[in-house]
Amino acid sequence: MEAEAAAKRARESGDAAAAGAGEQAGISAVIPGWFSEISPMWPGEAHSLKVEKVLFQGKSDYQNVMVFQSSTYGKVLVLDGVIQVTERDECAYQEMITHLPLCSIKDPKKVLVIGGGDGGVLREVSRHSSVEQIDICEIDKMVVDVSKQFFPHLAVGFEDPRVSLHIGDGVAFLKNAPEGTYDAVIVDSSDPIGPAQELFEKPFFQSVARALRPGGVVCTQAESIWLHMHIIEDIVANCRQVFKGSVNYAWTTVPTYPSGVIGFMLCSTEGPTVDFQHPIFNIEDNEFSTKSKGPLKFYNSEIHSASFCLPSFAKRVIGSKAN
């Protein structure tokens, strides 16, 4: 009731426009001091975090960028009003999107990261001693700069000498990559609205497949089974048409992502068989990994295999796209 009264007072005092602007930026105008994540990607619901202090607000050529200190999840990176990273739970996403593909193939040497401007995926890729070359293509330099300033534990990935940073369009970068260049491609994209839209479409997956060696692997962010089954259906259908090796869907928990879960699409090109559900490299006990970046916080071999176990409703829908 108090929130409703506050909203009514705002409207009556002519502050409705300001309230709307606040919602668009992601800061709730109805409950001061709280960030509310509101998006057409999850209509009718919002996730809120208490804001201790706004540390950065800016607008790049592509999106609104904000960093704030929350009371329970540490520093939070927000792009266009949507949470991308929090200090508390980033490990679940970064470790899973990286080690699900890289622990499923033998000695990956060349890895491409599309997106991932916060540096977290780079941090995890650099745990693999077999990797000789890590290319990253991020469209928004502001994301990289902000991460280096406010999230050094993530941006440490940029310091690895094997990393080459390319600021530009990931779709164009892939089209220009020589055929069969990479052992693995990791697509750390935001939701399929705005600049990330192309990263969920069939032509992009075709470019990924061309850039991979035979038996090469890709892992891409693939939304929530609770909110986006219609999107996941399309992704699965496109991937089954493009990738002639393995095609699997995995998921994990990330408390600050919509519905508290996020999915991953894992595919391999025709060639040596890839069994994504059973990792062949045990990174959690790897001395190089622990020495270079410290112990893993989330990923292990058991959770790797478990992540492919789907609820019945999701299993039916994803299985229906098998042909």
Curated annotation (Swiss-Prot):
SUPFAM superfamilies (UniProt xref): S-adenosyl-L-methionine-dependent methyltransferases (SSF53335)
Record-listed E.C. numbers: 2.5.1.16
Pfam family, one: Spermine_synt_N
A single MF term (Gene Ontology): spermidine synthase activity
The entry's keywords: Polyamine biosynthesis, Spermidine biosynthesis, Transferase
Catalytic activity reported: S-adenosyl 3-(methylsulfanyl)propylamine + putrescine = S-methyl-5'-thioadenosine + spermidine + H(+)
Keyword Transferase: yes
Pathways involved: Amine and polyamine biosynthesis; spermidine biosynthesis; spermidine from putrescine: step 1/1
Superkingdom of this protein's organism: Eukaryota
Residues annotated to bind putrescine: 93, 188-191, 257
GO cellular component: cytosol
Any single biological process term in GO: spermidine biosynthetic process
Catalytic residues (positions): 188 (proton acceptor)
Limits of the PABS domain: 32-269
UniProt keyword Lipid metabolism present: no
CDD domains on file: AdoMet_MTases
Record InterPro entries: PABS, PABS_CS, SAM-dependent_MTases_sf, Spermi_synthase, Spermi_synthase_euk, Spermidine_synt_N, Spermidine_synt_N_sf
Top EC class for this record: transferase
Record: residues binding S-adenosyl 3-(methylsulfanyl)propylamine: 63, 94, 118, 138, 169-170, 188
Protein family (similarity comment): Belongs to the spermidine/spermine synthase family.
PANTHER family: SPERMIDINE SYNTHASE (PTHR11558:SF11), SPERMIDINE/SPERMINE SYNTHASE (PTHR11558)
Name of the protein this chain belongs to: Spermidine synthase 1
Record organism: Oryza sativa subsp. japonica (Rice)
Lineage: Eukaryota, Viridiplantae, Streptophyta, Embryophyta, Tracheophyta
